Amino acid sequence: MQRLLLLVSLFLVSTLGAAASPIAGQWRFVPERSTDLSPWRVYDLTITVEGDVVTLQRQLAAGRRVHEDTVRIDVSQAVNVVPSAYWPDNRHLGAYMGGDKTMKIRAEWLDQRRLLRLSTDLVLATQQGPRDLNILSDYKVSANGAQLTLTMLRSTRNRPVVYVFRRLTTEEAAKPAAKGKSE
């Protein structure tokens, strides 16, 4: 009986711990504190955490152009292979998803789940031919939980890309995402 009670307690603690991950929530891009988002103007990010699975849902917009994608990552897996037909991060560069059109993502939690670190490998198709790309991404929530900073270092760049987000209030999250204009 004590063993069963212990197992149930451990299950509840692990479930509540995952649900209470400080990084989970709805986030809105803050352009004045971030690297230029070109070619997009709006970036809303929703992060959900269910056990070992983290879901990153992006909504990007500029004018009438809108792009949405969802990436599910199982942090307990050594590598997550995620299909991706489109690379929206810098479409004005003339670089598109190439190779097998997948991202190989390795993930780990740091700092009591306040920081999610991803290492993503993919192949881009460019005018010069296929180009292997590695992106190191840190999603870090502030100590007070109000700000999320996404720092990305690409193997093709010397300087990191830094995006700052603010946590949406319950009222803001209930409204439809902004389309095409930053706030």
Tell what function each PLM region has:
Residues 19-183:
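Hydrophobic small-molecule pocket/channel-lining residues, especially in calycin-type beta-barrels
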